[in-house]
Amino acid sequence: ISDIKGVRYTEGRLLPYFFPDVFTEGGDPIGEARTNWMKARRAILRSPLDRIGYGGYLKLASNWPGFIDEIQNVVSKFRQIHENMQGTKSYVAPFKVAILNCWGGLRKWMSNQVHHSIYHRETYSAEGVLECLSGMPFDVEFIDFDDIRSGIPKDIGVIINVGDAYTAFSGAENWIDEKVVTAIRKFVDEGGGFIGVGEPTACQHQGRYFQLSDVMGVDREMGFSLSTDKYNTCDPHHFILEDIDTAIDFGEGTSRIYAQGKHYQILAQDGEYSQLVVNEYGKGHSVYFAGLPYSPQNCRILLRAIYYAAGMPEEMKHYYVTNVDTEVTVFPETKRIAVINNADAEEKTDLYIKGHLIDSLTLAPREMRWVDDAE
């Protein structure tokens, strides 16, 4: 919504709706309001809306003990964001991240595969990508395959392809177009990054299922190479997982993924098959995820994966917090920094600026702490 141009103001309607299915015995409208605000807050800090609102039957909300107080807190924090940013833009990395699918700029964030926050088992493992990106320090472009054919823009550092095979999300038959695969191979070979989630570049053709299996270092076993030896061993020691000390959630995942080539490293594995793989291709890098549902930990893994794929891991700590349940947004023009706690528990985190430890913070559950940028 905040990307819409040519309108007087933008407004987002937050959840929950004031409907009887939520405001009923056994319902938890306060819990839903908190959870949805924490997700929305990440995105609003990056690309703010002008207004927020709620919808439904007002009487239901007014009769629920404590709910109005919770909404007053949300509104107060929303105003606080605008007071501190003063209409300025937040800090972003020195490269853009591109989401590649069949819609490109036509649908943009609507390619999230979800409607009204309705859960679908078939899609939640892919939805995490855009949910995570919405609160990250990156300018995000949405490109289609004609954009690839016309020439990948120079300011794009990482291309992400997400979705099931033979869908508009992943690209279907576009992946057997020589112009497309050649352009992306050239992009990565010269130092660009490529991240795939689920069945990226998938289209069975000429003995390959993932048409960029050479770039990603993985392919999917479709029954044609069962007798081919696959020497896949896991080595989780990598920049991408340095903050991670608990099991990674791949959601439903993607079965029968195996690593192949000479320059891959398997970071996570389920039995004999791979779940998280990095690969070097020329001067560039790729990362493959079997699935990536939204969670604070997966946000951190994707953040690190993007900087790794872009070949700029040192840039990550330009502004950085150590605890995976916390995130940081910086407004250079107003010299204000927001550190947010995405957990329902107290969290401690260290704040880094330009690679140097600046402060150690203890944040209350769901807190948004504003500090001065002393840079």
Predicted regions and their residues:
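A short, well-structured beta->alpha microelement
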Residues: 130-152
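Short, well-ordered secondary-structure micro-motifs within conserved domains or adaptor modules
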Residues: 151-173
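C-terminal beta-strand-rich structural cap/linker in extracellular carbohydrate-active enzymes
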Residues: 161-162, 359-375
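A glycine-rich, often tryptophan-bearing local segment used as a flexible ligand/cofactor-contacting loop or short
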Residues: 171-246
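Catalytic beta-strand/loop cores that center a nucleophilic Ser/Cys/Thr
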Residues: 224-282, 290-301, 306-359, 363-364
